[in-house]
From Swiss-Prot:
Cellular localization per UniProt: Cytoplasm
UniProt name for this protein: Ribonucleoside-diphosphate reductase large subunit
Site feature: Important for electron transfer: 737-738
Interacts with thioredoxin/glutaredoxin (site feature) positions: 787, 790
Complex and partners: Heterodimer of a large and a small subunit. Interacts with RRM2B. Interacts with AHCYL1 which inhibits its activity.
UniProt superkingdom: Eukaryota
Modified residues (Phosphothreonine): 751
Disulfide bonds: 218-444
Cross-referenced Gene3D superfamilies: 3.20.70.20
Primary localization: cytoplasm
Length: 792
């Protein structure tokens, strides 16, 4: 049997040679657990004559990855094999790789199709000695296998389908793409990125330094006008943004309702649903080519709109196709008045914005006055019990996980952009809260701090370093505003005027584990607060320093910050004594700030996988999860838990199988000590009341909002109602992003004789179920505290 080498030569397959190659990459690993010969045995089983060394390495890496549950060092080894393979297949020198990317010729048409911008290449070539020598390739070996494979699959630039960049090249490309000729700043950013202190968002990693540097993650629009022109102009904006890979939030509350009169044609409107089906099809069609990533639109509606009940059905799996728009995402923009009326079981009036104009243009008391004046004037189209609509909302969430819940009055009352006008929606992921109008499409550029990195070996938290890195991020994101490619002019206008940015986090759960704090412990709750205080403090300080240099952002005057009111003041919260806010406030009073908004904890799905961290602000959902590779799927165990169990001599095959049998929970495994059980509770075992309380406590230092998922294993209408009202009363802006539920682990299979299941019985059951759900919902509204206790 022979193998084909990288240079095309053939060589006999040699067991020892494969073992030796793997052995060389085992430096620093625990050889009591890691067995290179075992990997070689499995690799040999998968061989065929004429296999290439690249395929051999890929197989060895996958084999090592499947052994991760034996010991976490196998995951490190798997990544090392894969990275070593990439290093053998790519050029080493950064400037050479950039030249190759620039000189790319498209094989289909023979044209020069540069993959990096000529300006980027010029800067790299002019500073190649400094940039080339700044790169430390060993840092590629610090990624875990799945982080590296994510980079390889989606982030590293390819030439004719073959990866041309190494991870370090990508990070330097991003750094130069942002900082241009400022080489000191580029190298500083490169070092922080490659040491994993923070990461820029995916669009920035994809596109920085390229010909079309579309580096923004989020776009927010409100309908240009309630007319055919307005609807289709807005649709075109959505299509152009989607083509450039932006996620979108659209406010549609101003669109007239079903049956509303249309003066131009003397006809009646078809309402929201047919319009949203057109948006749905555009989202499907504009997918960045080849279904790379389908367009993603979140549609925001206020609950007084006459079409609200139909809106709540749009994502359901059952029902007529022409009444559904399942590729869109749906969100409610909820005024406090609605929540008050649900709580007190009052009537709720549904209106058409064409007949009752301006409701989406006001908030708070002004909204309540206008809404109640329309009620008094008899302009309403339909009156329902507020709880009837609430029931429909909860029903939709239980079935589909959405609509998202955002509180319009909190979003406006606690916004530093409130001087611009009423904010009408959030974005696709519910953490961006920015002003939009017919002339302005709001934009946000994002980055996230890896919170696990700031835990010191002595189990203290390095707040100084956290503030320092936050300041670098502010400077980076502020630069991105100026160098960014904007798909539409309204986005350019808005971003240049208000200069908002969004700094988020990942690895909060990892930081708690490294500090040895259970997620719900008082220590974790204090650290949660202090982390976000620090980030907000550092961000304000950096933005103020930028304002000293370049002046405040254009619409600064009249904003709460310009009056000395910071986010925590709007929450009526005093910060801890970690930072001295008085001199910072004085500095801001003197110079202003460069960015209207700063903090926005977003979901961090892909970038957290790259850095090997738990997502965003979330607790761990499980201590074991499945990963797929070409050769099959296998279980990965929470690496912190694996390390702890290994150190205590508790890790073996039987333990692994017990954790799998318990669906990733360790609470009922007798051999595991209590301190570890406390530390490794999954989100299903943590009180959601605590999760919401911690969200509110950090919320006082978050000037945008946060992507906050609610996890209820088996939601009932009472639990869900309690969660929503608790979050609303805590002052959250985003009450819920997704409702995450847990499928039954082993659903019992029932075989029904369908002939015997009479329609009458079915209808009776549905009626009983509805009565039970309504009773649970009402009980929850009437006995808030008790219900919260039973509704973890």
């Amino acid at each position: 049997m022979h193998v084909i080498k990288r240079d095309g030569r053939q060589e006999r397959v040699m067991f020892d040679k494969i073992t030796s190659r793997i052995q060389k990459l085992c430096y620093g690993l625990n050889m009591d657990f890691v067995d290179p010969a075992q990997i070689t045995m499995k690799v040999i089983q998968g061989l065929y004559s004429g296999v290439t060394t690249v395929e051999l390495d890929t197989l060895a890496a996958e084999t090592a990855a499947t052994l991760t549950t034996k010991h976490p060092d196998y995951a490190i080894l798997a990544a090392r094999i894969a990275v070593s393979n990439l290093h053998k297949e790519t050029k080493k020198v950064f400037s050479d790789v950039m030249e190759d990317l620039y000189n790319y010729i498209n094989p289909h048409n023979g044209r020069h199709s540069p993959m990096v911008a000529s300006s980027t290449l010029d800067i790299v070539m002019a500073n190649k000695d400094r940039l080339n020598s700044a790169i430390i390739y060993d840092r590629d070996f610090s990624y875990n296998y799945f982080g590296f494979k994510t980079l390889e699959r989606s982030y590293l630039l390819k030439i004719n389908g073959k990866v041309a960049e190494r991870p370090q090249h990508m990070l330097m490309r991003v750094s130069v793409g942002i900082h241009k000729e400022d080489i000191d700043a580029a190298i500083e950013t490169y070092n922080l990125l490659s040491e994993k202190w923070f990461t820029h968002a995916s669009p920035t990693l994809f596109n920085a330094g390229t010909n079309r540097p579309q580096l923004s993650s989020c776009f927010l629009l409100s309908m240009k006008d309630d007319s055919i022109e307005g609807i289709y102009d807005t649709l075109k904006q959505c299509a152009l943004i989607s083509k450039s890979a932006g996620g979108i939030g659209v406010a549609v509350s101003c669109i007239r309702a079903t049956g509303s009169y249309i003066a131009g044609t003397n006809g009646n409107s078809n309402g929201l649903v047919p319009m949203l089906r057109v948006y749905n099809n555009t989202a499907r069609y504009v997918d960045q080519g080849g279904n790379k990533r389908p367009g993603a639109f979140a549609i925001y509606l206020e609950p007084w709109h006459l079409d609200i009940f139909e809106f709540l059905d749009l994502k359901k799996n059952t029902g007529k196709e022409e009444q559904r728009a399942r590729d869109l995402f749906f969100a409610l923009w909820i005024p406090d008045l609605f929540m008050k009326r649900v709580e007190t079981n009052q009537d709720w009036s549904l209106m058409c914005p064409n007949e009752c104009p301006g409701l989406d243009e006001v908030w708070g008391e002004e909204f309540e006055k206008l809404y109640e004046s329309y009620e008094k004037q008899g302009r309403v189209r339909k009156v329902v019990k507020a709880q009837q609509l609430w029931y429909a909302i909860i029903e939709s969430q239980t079935e589909t996980g959405t609509p998202y819940m955002l509180y319009k009055d909190s979003c406006n009352r606690k916004s530093n952009q409130q001087n611009l006008g009423t904010i009408k929606c959030s974005n696709l992921c519910t953490e961006i809260v920015e002003y939009t109008s017919k002339d302005e499409v709001a934009v946000c550029n994002l980055a996230s701090l890896a919170l696990n990195m700031y835990v010191t070996p002595e189990h203290t938290y390095d707040f100084e370093k956290l503030a320092e890195v936050t300041k670098v991020i502010v400077r980076n994101l502020n630069k991105i505003i100026d160098i960014n490619y904007y798909p539409i002019p309204e986005a350019h206008l808005s971003n240049k005027r208000h200069r908002p940015i969004g700094i988020g986090v990942q690895g909060l759960a990892d930081a708690f584990i490294l500090m040895r704090y259970p997620f719900e412990s008082p220590e974790a709750q204090l650290l949660n607060k202090q982390i976000f205080e620090t980030i907000y403090y550092g961000a304000l300080e950096a933005s103020c320093e930028l304002a000293k240099e370049y002046g405040p952002y254009e619409t600064y005057e009249g904003s709460p910050v310009s009056k000395g009111i910071l986010q925590y003041d709007m929450w009526n919260v005093a910060p801890t004594d970690l930072w001295d806010w008085k001199p910072l406030k004085e500095k801001i009073a003197k110079y202003g700030i460069r960015n209207s908004l700063l903090i926005a904890p977003m979901p961090t799905a892909s970038t957290a996988q790259i850095l090997g961290n738990n997502e965003s602000i979330e607790p761990y959902t499980s201590n074991i999860y499945t990963r797929r590779v070409l050769s099959g799927e296998f279980q990965i165990v929470n690496p912190h838990l694996l390390k702890d169990l290994t150190e205590r001599g508790l890790w073996n095959e039987e333990m692994k199988n017990q954790i799998i049998a318990c669906n990733g929970s360790i609470q009922s495994i007798p051999e595991i000590p209590d301190d570890l059980k406390q530390l490794y509770k999954t989100v299903w075992e943590i009180s959601q009341k605590t999760v919401l309380k911690m969200a509110a406590e950090r919320g006082a230092f978050i000037d945008q909002s946060q992507s906050l998922n609610i996890h209820i294993a088996e939601p009932n209408y009472g639990k869900l109602t309690s969660m929503h009202f608790y979050g609303w009363k805590q002052g959250l802006k985003t009450g819920m992003y997704y409702l995450r539920t847990r499928p039954a682990a082993n659903p019992i299979q029932f075989t029904l004789n369908k002939e015997k299941l009479k329609d009458k019985e079915k209808a009776l059951k549905e009626e009983e179920e509805k009565e039970r759900n309504t009773a649970a919902m009402v009980c929850s509204l009437e006995n808030r505290e008790e219900c919260l206790m039973c509704g973890s």
